[in-house]
Amino acid sequence: MMNADHVEHVRAVLRESAEVKLRAAELCTEEIARGAELLAQAYAAKKKAIVFGNGGSAADAQHFVAELVGRFVHNRAALPALCLTANPSTVTCIANDFGYEELFARQLDAYAEPGDVAVGISTSGKSESVLRAFARARELGCVTIGLTGRDGGGMPALCDVCVVVPSDATARIQETHITILHLWCEAIEARLFGMISR
């Protein structure tokens, strides 16, 4: 027999997750829409997305890149995108030789071109490797888009667009981030290819 406390906990967590998304719908829609616009504009100009984050945010970055290069809903042309945590040899080389804080900035030196979009993900907005990457991306002429939560940390000052999810709970922030990344995929497919997901 299922423990009633466990069932109620599941219900409470699902409601909490939904409530964070509802708050984001009230507070973050302009930034989310602007992020979609900047990504679509970059792809229309034959630029690429370079995506990065640590831990769970690295997984979100990899997920986003997979849906850009592969597909989200519709079969369409592949879109150029790189995830800066996907190559273990590169990650460990840079972390060992230059320090972990330089992990993403060093790769931007190698890959980024003016007009590319640097998308950084950090639930706290305080990850030094992400902040350094945004500073380097700006020096290199990239558009900068951030996904964060809590009070945004140092990210809003370094981003052309920064979506600050209205929550202090890491898991709830991450759940909202993946929804936003899916919204961006949907918007890109609609604007570039006329493919509507609904």
What are these regions (language model features)?
Residues 48-65:
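Glycine/serine-rich anion-binding loops at beta->alpha junctions
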Residues 26-45:
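A short, well-structured juxtamembrane/interface segment
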Residues 1-27:
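Generic N-terminal amphipathic, Lys/Arg-enriched alpha-helix
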